[in-house]
Swiss-Prot record:
Organism: Tolumonas auensis (strain DSM 9187 / NBRC 110442 / TA 4)
Protein purpose: IGPS catalyzes the conversion of PRFAR and glutamine to IGP, AICAR and glutamate. The HisF subunit catalyzes the cyclization activity that produces IGP and AICAR from PRFAR using the ammonia provided by the HisH subunit.
Record-listed E.C. numbers: 4.3.2.10
Name of the featured protein: Imidazole glycerol phosphate synthase subunit HisF
Catalytic EC class: lyase
Keywords, alphabetical: Amino-acid biosynthesis, Cytoplasm, Histidine biosynthesis, Lyase
Pathway membership: Amino-acid biosynthesis; L-histidine biosynthesis; L-histidine from 5-phospho-alpha-D-ribose 1-diphosphate: step 5/9
Gene assigned in the entry: hisF
Length: 257
């Protein structure tokens, strides 16, 4: 396996970076471009930007900030938000993004995954999955339109089945957003990650729950994920990226410089 990746996640709403808890009650974290530059300078391996209300608002991500981010950072970045067509993805990639991620639009039209992979290559196509553990049924369920709590809905897919399906259709990477853990900083859902890791033959990125450095270590060493995505611990300065990388190296995790 290649070196593991540390990936700050920047949720974008109304032109600024926000962060919620379990996808609700978002507070402003700062401006997009300065935060992106800060993380690149601190040693992040990659950045992910989610325009969290684009799909629920039936629009495509605002491209004006995509080009500004591309001008100030020299690490790969991925953009998500309402991408419903090859043309939508093409424009975002032309503005400077290295990858595009689709989530709700893929659930609406699974064939879109294949169309994008055929046009741009699987290495450019990430599928985000918002997974919710239903304690009543004991199942992991995929949710859609999670950027707007009034429109969020449970889909017909269980998370394991959707993970298998998106790989068949050409997903080059999967970001597993674990909704129950999101923003509460109690650790990634290692049980879910191990379950999905066994089904996932493409790079798997853990998202939701990081609160301490050991949580990153456990995601890499116990669940064998390729990357760990986090937001609030980076936005609020709880975990500095250089210190996190030094810790992980010391714990035997192969990490990029």
């Amino acid at each position: 396996m290649l070196a593991r990746r540390i990936i700050p996640c920047l949720d974008v709403k109304d032109g600024v970076v926000v962060k919620g808890i379990q996808f609700r009650n978002h507070e402003v974290m700062g401006d997009i471009v300065p935060l992106a530059k800060r993380y690149a300078d601190e040693g992040a391996d990659e950045l992910v930007f989610y325009d969290i209300t684009a799909s629920s608002d039936a629009r495509v991500v605002d491209k004006s900030w995509v080009s500004r981010v591309a001008e100030v950072i020299d690490i790969p970045f991925c953009v998500a938000g309402g991408i419903k067509s090859v043309e939508d993805a093409k424009r975002i990639l032309e503005f400077g993004a290295d990858k595009v991620s689709i989530n709700s639009p893929a659930l609406e039209n699974p064939a879109l995954i294949t169309e994008l992979a055929d046009r741009f290559g699987v290495q450019c196509i990430v599928v985000g999955i918002d997974s919710y553990f239903d304690a009543a049924t004991g199942q992991y369920q995929v949710k859609q339109y999670t950027g707007d709590e009034n429109r969020t809905r449970i889909t017909k897919w269980t998370t394991p089945d959707w993970v298998v399906e998106v790989q068949k259709r050409g997903a080059g990477e999967i970001v597993l957003n674990m909704m129950n853990q999101d923003g509460v900083r109690q650790g990634y859902d290692l049980t879910q990650l191990k379950l999905i890791r066994d089904l996932c033959k493409v790079p798997l990125i853990a998202s939701g729950g990081a609160g301490e450095m050991v949580h990153f270590r456990d995601a890499f060493q116990i669940a064998d994920v390729d990357g760990a995505l986090a937001a609030s611990v980076f936005h609020k300065g709880i975990i500095p990226i250089p210190e996190l990388k030094a810790y992980l190296r010391n714990e035997g995790v192969q990490i990029r410089d």
